[in-house]
C-alpha cells in the first residue's frame, strides 16, 4: 500500500475528521470567550473596582530611561492585568467544557440504562417453551 493511500485512509477516518472539526470549533469558541471577557465581563468589573482597565495593570520593575549613549532603554514591566484576563478566559472555557462533558456523560448513562430488547430468536424460543409447558 502506498504512503499516499495510507495517508488518505488515515485522514478520512471518522476520528481524524471529528478532531479537525473540534479544533476549528474550539478556535472559534476561544475568540468568542476572549471577546466576552475583554468586552463584556472585565469593563463592568473594572468599573466596580475603581475604573480599572485590567489589561493595562502592570508592575514596573524598572522605568524606561535614556542610556549613556542616548538610546532609550525600555521599561521592565510585569503585565499581570493580561494574566488576569487570560485566567478568566481559561476558567470560562474550562467550565464550558465541563458542562459539555457532563451532558455527554448523562446522555451515555441514559443509553446504557435502557436494556436491550431480547432478540427475535429468544422471544420465539420463549414462546415455544411456554407452549410446551401447557
Swiss-Prot record:
GO cellular component, one term: plasma membrane
UniProt similarity note: Belongs to the MscL family.
PANTHER family cross-referenced by the UniProt entry: LARGE-CONDUCTANCE MECHANOSENSITIVE CHANNEL, MECHANOSENSITIVE CHANNEL MSCL
Main location: membrane
Keywords: Cell inner membrane, Cell membrane, Ion channel, Ion transport, Membrane, Transmembrane, Transmembrane helix, Transport
Subunit field text: Homopentamer.
UniProt KW Repeat keyword: no
Membrane topology: Multi-pass membrane protein
General function of this protein: Channel that opens in response to stretch forces in the membrane lipid bilayer. May participate in the regulation of osmotic pressure changes within the cell.
Transmembrane feature ranges: 16-36, 84-104
Cross-referenced Gene3D superfamilies: Large-conductance mechanosensitive channel, MscL, domain 1
Domain of life of the organism encoding this protein: Bacteria
GO molecular function term, any single one: mechanosensitive monoatomic ion channel activity
NCBIfam families for the chain: mscL (TIGR00220), PRK00567.1-4 (NF001843), PRK13952.1 (NF010557)
Identification of the protein by name: Large-conductance mechanosensitive channel
Compartments, as annotated in UniProt: Cell inner membrane
